[in-house]
């Protein structure tokens, strides 16, 4: 089965942001009410059910519907007004919030800056060494303020520390027993909280 592909030139992406307004017959700064009113009028005129003999009516109706969908969505409309259909394509690929970043990074000065920094750092070799090897194999690592010998504790000292901690705990006997807890026990005390640190 052969596929019939027309030999039409594919539409190019505009950057002016006027084609959708021209489809609806409006100027670029048209209000939402004007867009809705014009859309209803053109949709009724070019609807495929009202024009069964016209094969181009369905295509025209699709264009009108697409223009209405984009121009009534404020986010897409702002992108279209600023960057044209190329901006809508970028928004579809990378998200609405990344359109400005894409066009900023694809500008001539951003590309030039990228090339200059690449040349100055030896094709980013210095940046790679700094990140991967911490600036020439650790010469820039911070030194510890305390020497490592202070961290060693002999077993005898550790045993002595444990015995003194136990002896201190014996000086304060447990006086109160915990209250019985059940499902109805409140987790928060009923008395008002006091944030005073003075006893």
Curated annotation (Swiss-Prot):
- Which GO CC terms are listed, alphabetically? cytoplasm; membrane
Bilayer topology: Lipid-anchor
Q: Give its localization.
A: Membrane
Keyword Phosphoprotein attributed: yes
Which parts of the sequence belong to the J domain? 19-84
Phosphoserine PTM sites in chain numbering:
14, 16
Concerning PTM, the database record says: Palmitoylated.
Q: What are the alphabetically sorted keywords of the record?
A: Chaperone, Lipoprotein, Membrane, Palmitate, Phosphoprotein
Which SMART domains did the record assign? DnaJ
User: InterPro entries given for it?
Assistant: DnaJ_C_subfamily_member5, DnaJ_domain, J_dom_sf
Entries under Pfam families matching the protein:
DnaJ (PF00226)
Q: How does it assemble?
A: Interacts with the chaperone complex consisting of HSC70 and SGTA.
Q: What is this protein called?
A: DnaJ homolog subfamily C member 5B
Annotated source species: Bos taurus
Organism placement in taxonomy: Eukaryota, Metazoa, Chordata, Craniata, Vertebrata
Per UniProt, what is the name of the gene that codes for the protein in this document? DNAJC5B
């Amino acid at each position: 089965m052969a596929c019939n592909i027309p030999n039409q030139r594919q539409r190019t992406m505009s950057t002016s942001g006027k084609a959708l307004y021209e489809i609806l017959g409006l100027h670029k700064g048209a209000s939402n009410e004007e867009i809705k009113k014009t859309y209803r009028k053109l949709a009724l005129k070019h609807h495929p059910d009202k024009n069964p003999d016209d094969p181009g009516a369905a295509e025209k109706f699709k264009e009108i519907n697409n223009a209405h969908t984009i121009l009534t969505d404020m986010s897409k409309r702002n992108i279209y007004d600023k960057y044209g259909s190329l901006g809508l394509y970028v928004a579809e690929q990378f998200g609405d919030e990344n359109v400005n970043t894409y066009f900023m990074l694809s500008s001539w000065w951003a590309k030039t800056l990228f090339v200059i920094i690449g040349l100055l750092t030896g094709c980013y070799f210095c940046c790679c060494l700094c990140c991967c090897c911490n600036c020439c194999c650790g010469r820039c690592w911070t030194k510890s303020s305390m020497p490592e010998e202070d961290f060693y504790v002999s077993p005898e000292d550790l045993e002595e520390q444990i015995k003194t901690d136990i002896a201190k705990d014996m000086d304060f006997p447990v006086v109160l027993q915990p209250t019985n807890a059940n499902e109805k026990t409140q987790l928060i005390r009923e008395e008002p909280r006091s944030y005073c640190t003075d006893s």
